[in-house]
């Protein structure tokens, strides 16, 4: 169920900062037409950090309603407060999301035991499939393989999104968990290698821009056709890089605006992509066949 290309969906906004529901609905339908295997709503790319609680839950609800069971919906419900993560996760279950994605608590830098207790509490309190999410470059905390292994035995915890871009880390976690635990890449540039080593798919920023290509790459890699997947991925390499010229989702929103899907608005403290990067990102989009 949780395999392949899972788009880390942007949250469209209008110039006044309000949420653009029409653009959101059109994006979802486009992704389903293009073959995206799952929708991840209100994660990092979906600007969860600048949505209030009501908006966060409303986006989840509207995504679930628009998808209407056609593919799985994974709701981002992580927070650096366990009580807030609980409220979001409960709301996602009520909205009938298929699963939740919970980033490690950021800024307050919990210990490994703190991480373990945080996730155990959420898994115990809300009966919905839950994915751990380790992205130390953003959170200032790294969930170690031994902690992942402890959590992999907890009911309702089904897998992890790993954004370390380390194949060694993937293999360490695989060695400590059983075959039922799901590994999803959180790094587009290394996702083919990740799947070649037994990963189950990726939660992709690049899929916002080239969903059909990303889905096909995942299908090939998961079928064991790794060299074909690499060949198809090669023209996307400049795009993988360019989408992080500034903090995600600043570049991807510029790209989506360039494609005509939304106006590219962001909420402070994020600001539009610096003009010095426009040509590089546009060239990467051309290389990838996005425009």
From Swiss-Prot:
A biological process (GO) of this protein is: lysine biosynthetic process via diaminopimelate
Please name the catalytic residues of this protein.
133 (proton donor/acceptor), 161 (schiff-base intermediate with substrate)
The pathway where this protein functions is:
Amino-acid biosynthesis; L-lysine biosynthesis via DAP pathway; (S)-tetrahydrodipicolinate from L-aspartate: step 3/4
Superkingdom as given in the UniProt entry: Bacteria
Q: Name one GO cellular component term.
A: cytosol
Q: InterPro entries of this UniProt entry?
A: Aldolase_TIM, DapA, DapA-like, Schiff_base-form_aldolases_AS, Schiff_base-form_aldolases_CS
- Give all cystine bridges in this chain: none
For site (Part of a proton relay during catalysis), what residue positions does UniProt give?
Answer: 44, 107
Task: Give the transmembrane region(s).
Answer: none
Electron transport listed as a keyword: no
Where, per UniProt, does this protein localize? Answer: Cytoplasm
Provide the alphabetized UniProt keywords: Amino-acid biosynthesis, Cytoplasm, Diaminopimelate biosynthesis, Lyase, Lysine biosynthesis, Schiff base
User: Which GO terms fall under molecular function for this chain's record?
Assistant: 4-hydroxy-tetrahydrodipicolinate synthase activity
Q: What is its main location?
A: cytoplasm
Kindly state the subunit structure of this protein: Homotetramer; dimer of dimers.
Similarity section = Belongs to the DapA family.
Q: What does this protein do?
A: Catalyzes the condensation of (S)-aspartate-beta-semialdehyde [(S)-ASA] and pyruvate to 4-hydroxy-tetrahydrodipicolinate (HTPA).
HAMAP family from the UniProt entry: DapA
Name of the protein described by the UniProt record:
4-hydroxy-tetrahydrodipicolinate synthase
* UniProt organism field: Teredinibacter turnerae (strain ATCC 39867 / T7901)
């Amino acid at each position: 169920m949780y395999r392949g290309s899972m788009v880390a969906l942007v949250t469209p906004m209008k110039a006044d900062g309000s949420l653009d529901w029409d653009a959101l609905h059109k994006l979802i339908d486009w992704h389903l037409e293009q073959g995206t295997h799952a929708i991840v709503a209100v994660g990092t790319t979906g600007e969860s950090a600048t949505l209030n609680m009501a908006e966060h839950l409303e986006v989840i609800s509207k995504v679930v309603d628009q998808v209407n069971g056609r593919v799985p919906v994974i709701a981002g419900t992580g927070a650096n407060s366990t009580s807030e993560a609980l409220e979001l996760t409960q709301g996602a279950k009520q909205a009938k999301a298929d699963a939740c994605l919970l980033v490690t608590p950021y800024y307050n830098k919990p210990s490994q035991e703190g991480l373990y207790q945080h996730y155990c509490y959420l898994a115990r309190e809300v009966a919905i499939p839950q994915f751990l999410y380790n992205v130390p470059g953003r959170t200032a905390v790294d969930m170690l393989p031994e902690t992942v292994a402890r959590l992999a035995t907890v009911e309702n915890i089904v897998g992890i999104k790993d954004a370390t871009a380390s194949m060694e880390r993937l293999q360490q976690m695989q060695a400590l968990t059983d075959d039922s635990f799901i590994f999803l890449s959180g790094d587009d540039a290394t996702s083919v290698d990740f799947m070649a080593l037994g990963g189950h798919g990726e939660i992709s920023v690049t899929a916002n821009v080239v969903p059909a290509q990303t889905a096909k790459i995942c299908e090939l890699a998961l079928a064991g056709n790794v060299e074909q997947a690499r060949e198809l991925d090669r023209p996307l390499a400049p795009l993988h890089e360019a989408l992080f010229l500034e903090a995600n989702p600043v570049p991807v929103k510029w790209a989506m605006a360039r494609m005509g899907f939304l106006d590219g608005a962001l909420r402070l403290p994020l600001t539009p992509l610096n003009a010095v990067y426009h040509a590089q990102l546009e060239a990467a989009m051309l290389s990838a066949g996005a425009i």
